[in-house]
């Protein structure tokens, strides 16, 4: 099994189903508002807000929408969202982490638990699977921004820990603490990245059958479609055949 990493699969799958633009923009706006409320409304001085704005631009969210979401925080938005991390196991014993921003903890927990249960998995306690992931920073550039060698050299100089280059682009991994500085250094050389954010990176991926893979994608679809869910991570990989089918 050649194995496509689950991270790429989820990103491609999410992009496919996120044709529902209003839902996507709503999630992005929520993260922008929360990030601006927790820190300064200036993306240059607020790494989390910077990451949220980059994500919004990657989805072609209108500039007015982005600015409105930032101003909503500055205007004392009365809505308060709790940041919650859910952890559990999906089909095939695959570990899944779900990050959510919700104004109703009970509703979110009930819905997410239901998705896990119906998929044949189960929702666990916080910490039940996160030990199988590393909390790291990732900076992404399109492949045409630099050669693999040039990107590797620049990333090392910027203090990055690892680089993965392919025809799909460059992924530069950093520690949590060095993400912001590394991103600034690379931006000075290659321009604005398409992404710069903290993620949960699996330490190892589990190769699953196509049957289990389809069940996992169904679970991930349900999770990503939930209004409160911001990010989903899992530690599996599927065959090239299923990856092509899911992306098609």
UniProtKB/Swiss-Prot annotation:
Chief place of localization: cytoplasm
Pfam families assigned: TACO1_YebC_N, Transcrip_reg
Protein name (Swiss-Prot/TrEMBL): Probable transcriptional regulatory protein OCAR_7305/OCA5_c08120
GO biological process, alphabetically ordered: regulation of DNA-templated transcription
Family: Belongs to the TACO1 family.
Statement: the UniProt record of this protein carries the keyword Ligase: no
Cellular location(s): Cytoplasm
PANTHER family: TRANSCRIPTIONAL REGULATORY PROTEIN YEBC-RELATED, TRANSLATIONAL ACTIVATOR OF CYTOCHROME C OXIDASE 1
Keywords, comma-separated and alphabetical: Cytoplasm, DNA-binding, Transcription, Transcription regulation
Residue ranges of the TM segments: none
InterPro entries: Integrase-like_N, TACO1_YebC-like_2nd/3rd_dom, TACO1_YebC_N, Transcrip_reg_TACO1-like, Transcrip_reg_TACO1-like_dom3, YebC-like
Signal peptide stretch: none
Cellular component per GO, a single term: cytosol
Highest rank taxon of the organism: Bacteria
The keyword Transcription is assigned to this record: yes
A GO MF term: DNA binding
């Amino acid at each position: 099994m050649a194995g496509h990493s689950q991270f790429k699969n989820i990103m491609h799958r999410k992009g496919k189903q996120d044709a529902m633009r209003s839902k996507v923009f709503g999630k992005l706006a929520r993260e922008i508002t929360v990030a601006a409320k927790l820190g300064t409304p200036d993306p240059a001085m607020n790494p989390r807000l910077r990451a949220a704005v980059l994500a919004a631009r990657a989805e072609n969210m209108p500039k007015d929408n982005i600015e409105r979401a930032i101003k909503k925080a500055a205007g004392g938005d009365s809505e308060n969202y709790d940041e919650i991390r859910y952890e559990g196991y999906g089909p095939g014993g695959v570990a899944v982490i779900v990050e959510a921003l919700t104004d109703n903890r009970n509703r979110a927990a009930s819905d997410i638990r239901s998705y896990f249960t119906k998929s044949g998995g189960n929702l666990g306690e916080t910490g039940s699977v996160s030990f199988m992931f590393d909390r790291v920073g990732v900076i992404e550039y399109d492949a045409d921004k630099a050669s693999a060698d040039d990107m590797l050299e620049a990333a090392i100089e910027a203090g990055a820990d690892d680089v993965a280059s392919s025809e799909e682009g460059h992924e530069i991994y950093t520690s949590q603490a060095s993400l912001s500085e590394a991103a600034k250094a690379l931006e000075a050389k290659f321009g604005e990245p398409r992404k710069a954010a903290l993620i949960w990176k699996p330490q190892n991926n589990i190769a699953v059958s196509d049957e289990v893979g389809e069940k996992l994608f169904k679970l991930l679809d349900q999770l990503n479609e939930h209004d409160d869910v911001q990010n989903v991570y899992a530690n599996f990989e599927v065959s090239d055949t299923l990856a092509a089918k899911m992306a098609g």
